[in-house]
Amino acid sequence: SYKLKKNDKIDVHNFNFSERVNKKIKFIYSPTKKELFSNSIFIENNENFVVINKPAGIAVQSGTKSKKNIIDILRKTQEFKDARPYTVHRIDKETTGILIVAKNRKYAQLLTSLFRLRKIHKTYLGIVLGELKENKGTLIDILFYYEGRKKIKTKAITRFSVIDSNNNYSLLKLDPET
């Protein structure tokens, strides 16, 4: 096996490939410290917030299962020399994507409110096994989580549309509502 590194090139000639993959493929990537501290992860940097391209393989916040995380790393950067990083939303550890981190309480509250009011929209791309019967639709499921010892259930709604597909895989645009 080969661990992908930044700037590695992967050629994809056509999404509608005909060869069937008979085994599960799992890409595990953990960025190096050099990559995490490089300026290439910063998309926007101003006095109130940063927008970064969060790599897969690293958690946003510390937790029981994650030793390194984006917030602790940002604390050590020049961009947060005189500021404290505030998370305003999260992305799963294994997901690559845009992450906004506030540099002060005022912008943390503002950006958190904009996410809560759905003024800032998240969109994901995903590859799933098989072809979907419908090109557009809504996925509704129930999620469970705990607040302390209390089990909370909430509805999860995601709209999807098929961008491309073949007999084996479908490339989807996913827009979570909740």
Task: Please place each PLM-identified region on the residue numbering.
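RNA pseudouridine synthases
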Residues: S1-T178
